[in-house]
């Protein structure tokens, strides 16, 4: 596998296929989201705002959880991991997209494309696993509150976090290896705005069935399996909440779980649409719009959803702001 990657680095390395000479692709060209100049300027402004909100929002969540001792609980430990994953997820794609809005020729090197896919899949698949872990945490908190502290220990939280990142790394390694094991000769124009396996496979010079099946199998592992766990957890949560006598307890449970459920629907819905259906020979505009949703919009919405619907996070923010105001007065 490594030797195959090394042979791709030669600029315009010549090979022979039958009687016809072809060249290995050394870089890819994106068609982007639009070819219209005015539309690209508007998209640049929109994506810049989204990216700034993503960075500021997720960094704020990470800082608040680190500084406020009241947020040193399993739920916020996993939320901090999720915010970090969102930050890496968006940063692996959006800055390059912003640059491409300002230039006529939108290119990326072969190795740059490979690196982008590795990071994108690593943090994206890790986020899938983290959302499943967070649903299990909510299940234990709502359905087994008396055993919560003994089940969700620090050691268990660290282990679940490690397994989430390890599963993301495994899926990233498998999908990237299968994608770049294929030969890419001659054609190098990607009808997309970043390197994503389904779009890249359309340029492969041989049949991609085995690679598509490998990516589909990994999708089952990292998308459908966690979704099944999430659905099972929420089925038990809803059953428990309905039986609660306290109206305040019901409201608190639905508020806490509601934020997580919104994030799950947004992220998994778009991910399953892209990776769990047959790969067509052409990239449709709808495919690119769905990709925008989970690469740019969802990472921006996550901190907003969790902070606006969470009293603890809002309390930590008020405490931090009050501390800053007090220090300025002194």
From Swiss-Prot:
Membrane protein topology class: Multi-pass membrane protein
Extracellular side: 1-41, 96-116, 175-211, 276-288
Ranges annotated as spanning the membrane: 42-65, 74-95, 117-136, 156-174, 212-235, 253-275, 289-308
MF-aspect GO terms: G protein-coupled receptor activity; olfactory receptor activity
CDD domains in alphabetical order: 7tmA_OR2D-like
InterPro entries: GPCR_Rhodpsn, GPCR_Rhodpsn_7TM, Olfact_rcpt
GO biological process, one term: detection of chemical stimulus involved in sensory perception of smell
Positions annotated with a glycan in the UniProt record: 21
Keyword terms: Cell membrane, G-protein coupled receptor, Glycoprotein, Membrane, Olfaction, Receptor, Sensory transduction, Transducer, Transmembrane, Transmembrane helix
Protein origin, superkingdom: Eukaryota
One GO cellular component term: plasma membrane
Pfam families: 7tm_4
PANTHER family: OLFACTORY RECEPTOR
Identification of the protein by name: Olfactory receptor 2D3
Annotated source species: Homo sapiens
Record gene name: OR2D3
């Amino acid at each position: 596998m490594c030797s195959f990657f090394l042979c791709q680095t030669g600029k315009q390395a010549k090979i022979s296929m039958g009687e016809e000479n072809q060249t290995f692709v050394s870089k890819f060209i994106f068609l982007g989201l639009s070819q219209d100049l005015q539309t690209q300027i508007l998209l640049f402004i929109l994506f810049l705002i989204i990216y700034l909100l993503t960075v500021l929002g997720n960094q704020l969540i990470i800082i608040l959880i680190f500084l406020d001792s009241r947020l040193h609980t399993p739920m916020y430990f996993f939320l901090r991991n999720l915010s970090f994953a969102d930050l890496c997820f968006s940063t692996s794609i959006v800055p390059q997209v912003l640059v491409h809005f300002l230039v006529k020729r939108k290119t990326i090197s072969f190795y740059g494309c490979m690196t982008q896919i590795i990071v994108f899949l690593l943090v994206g698949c890790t986020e899938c696993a983290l959302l499943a872990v967070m649903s299990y945490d909510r299940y234990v908190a709502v359905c087994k509150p008396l055993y919560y502290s003994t089940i969700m220990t620090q050691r268990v939280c660290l282990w679940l976090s490690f397994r989430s990142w390890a599963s993301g790394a495994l899926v990233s390694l498998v999908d990237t290896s299968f994608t770049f094991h294929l030969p890419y000769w001659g054609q190098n124009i990607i009808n997309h705005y970043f390197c994503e396996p389904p779009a890249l496979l359309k340029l492969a010079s041989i049949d991609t069935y085995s690679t598509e099946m490998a990516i589909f199998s990994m999708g089952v592992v990292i998308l459908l399996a966690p979704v099944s766990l999430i659905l099972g957890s929420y089925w038990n949560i809803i059953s428990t909440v309905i039986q609660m006598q306290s109206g305040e307890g019901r409201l608190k449970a639905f508020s806490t779980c509601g934020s997580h459920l919104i994030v799950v629907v947004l992220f998994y819905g778009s991910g399953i649409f892209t990776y769990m259906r047959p790969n067509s020979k052409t990239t449709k505009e709808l495919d690119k719009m769905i990709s925008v949703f989970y690469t740019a919009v969802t990472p921006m919405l996550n901190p907003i959803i969790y902070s606006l619907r969470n009293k603890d996070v809002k309390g930590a923010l008020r405490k931090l702001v009050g501390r800053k105001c007090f220090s300025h007065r002194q």
